[in-house]
């Protein structure tokens, strides 16, 4: 068992989640800005 390996894998999962979430967050932010005018 290698804690660093586990940590690395967790970090990759977090990074993947952030990368997938970023476009959605940007879209929502843009939609809100447009809605506010």
From Swiss-Prot:
The modification Glycine amide is found at residue 37. Coiled coil: none annotated. Its main location: secreted. It holds the Pfam family Cecropin. Keywords: Amidation, Antibiotic, Antimicrobial, Immunity, Innate immunity, Secreted. GO terms for cellular component: extracellular region. One of its GO terms (biological process) is innate immune response. It is found in: Secreted. InterPro entries: Cecropin. Cecropins have lytic and antibacterial activity against several Gram-positive and Gram-negative bacteria. Belongs to the cecropin family. This is Bactericidin B-4. It comes from Manduca sexta (Tobacco hawkmoth).
